[in-house]
A protein has these predicted regions:
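Solvent-exposed alpha-helices and their adjacent loops that cap or buttress functional pockets
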Residues: 118, 143-146, 270-273, 298-300, ...
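Hard-cation-handling environments
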Residues: 178-319, 329-330
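Short, surface-exposed amphipathic charged segments that create phosphate/polyanion-binding patches used
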Residues: 95-99, 236-244, 357-361
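Short, basic, glycine/proline-bearing loop/turn elements
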Residues: 3, 123, 156-162, 254, ...
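A conditional alpha-helix N-cap/helix-loop micro-motif detector
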Residues: 9, 171-175, 259-260, 284, ...
Length: 362
């Protein structure tokens, strides 16, 4: 048996440790430079699961068990193998596989399986999430087209949304909007811009955007990265990146434009302070993490802006924040009046838009 991980985003990889908790001992196959990030994300997930179960059990007199523990994560890692892309790897006479770049996030890949029975070979392609091949995001690698497979199990995130535009024009407009919000809110109004962001990929992309906006500017905003997991992934990127991406990332990290907040006490101090700044914190959907404390502080503040930069599921706190007509927001059973400004940048998606999906699949 084999388990294939197309990429390390939580919705595609963070149930794998549970499979090992339940007794599985199959090898997990992922692309090169993915294992350390998978480890960091899975350990963080285990910690959150164990912590939340303790709270729920205590408050409701239950005896729930966490999805998995840190020991299950380490068991998974014992069986996790990194494999190179664009190389057909033969398992036996009947099965081979190839990992092909998907252009979604760092290390994302499509999985092409070759099944040979009675001398006849058929192929199955599992795309995982596919990136935007026209605009693309930094530190990702380019999407690579697979010319043919007998059967395709393909992503369709925007398969019913031809109205969503994420092209070059939309990206430029969003970058202009991003810069305008920062300079109006921070430089002119001495306020704050709070950015809920996914720890993996989106936060690093935002940091590079900010660096490139202001590296040659006389005025630079104060920028905080307030998330232990995000910081670990920044460190992983320093080890994983190669070529021009590595050069650009190292230049960004050497710029001293960013302050990384690891300790909880420093995060609490930042929440309580009135310093005009940009704060990037996780989680992107605002369902957990330090971002919730920043939102409690900033949602009632008319001199604060929440900038939403990613997908949010219906009913998540992030989706509620996108509704500018809401009068109140409830966080941790406490209601807060909505006085902050709220904006969305829609072109930063790591997913292929509708018309690219049509082109990829036809």
């Amino acid at each position: 048996d084999l388990i294939f991980g197309t990429h390390v985003h939580a919705d595609h990889s963070l149930l794998i440790p549970k499979i090992y908790r339940d007794g599985c001992r199959a090898a997990t196959i992922i692309s090169e430079n993915s294992k350390q990030i998978l480890k960091d994300m899975a350990l963080d997930s285990a910690y959150i699961s164990e912590r939340d179960v303790l709270v729920i059990n205590s408050q409701h007199n239950k005896n729930y068990k966490p999805l998995y523990s840190a020991s299950d994560v380490y068991k998974m890692l014992e069986y996790t193998l990194e494999k190179p892309v664009n190389q057909k790897i033969v398992i036996d006479d009947e099965l081979a596989f190839e990992l092909i770049p998907a252009g979604h996030i760092l290390g994302s890949c499509q999985v092409k399986l070759y099944f040979t029975i009675d001398g006849t070979t058929k192929t199955l392609l599992v795309t995982g999430d596919l990136g935007n091949k026209i605009v693309g995001n930094r530190f990702v690698g380019k999407y690579q087209q697979v010319e043919y497979a007998d059967v395709v199990i393909g992503e369709s995130t925007y398969g019913d949304r031809p109205d969503i535009k994420t092209g070059i024009k939309e990206r430029k407009n969003d970058l202009d909007k991003f810069k305008s919000i920062i300079e109006t809110q921070i430089h002119e109004m001495n306020g704050r811009v709070i950015i809920p962001s996914f720890s993996m990929s989106r936060s690093q992309q935002l940091a590079l955007m900010l660096y490139e906006m202001y590296k040659d500017s006389d005025w630079k905003p104060k920028i905080y990265i307030d998330s232990p997991l995000t910081i670990k992934i920044f460190e992983d990127y320093e080890e994983c990146l190669e070529g021009q991406d590595k050069i650009d990332f190292d230049n960004m990290m050497a710029s001293n434009m960013f302050t990384f907040i690891k300790e909880s006490e420093d995060s609490k101090y930042l929440v309580a302070s009135n310093e005009p700044c940009v704060i990037i914190s996780s989680s992107g959907m605002c369902q957990s993490g330090r971002i919730r404390h920043h939102l409690k502080r900033c949602i009632p503040d008319s001199n604060a802006t929440v900038l939403l930069v990613g997908f949010s599921t219906e009913g998540s706190l992030a989706s509620l924040l996108k509704d500018n007509k809401r009068k109140t927001i409830t966080i941790d059973q406490k209601e807060y009046p909505c006085r902050c400004a709220s904006y969305s940048l829609k072109s930063l998606s790591g997913h292929a838009p509708f018309w690219q999906l049509v082109d990829m699949y036809t």
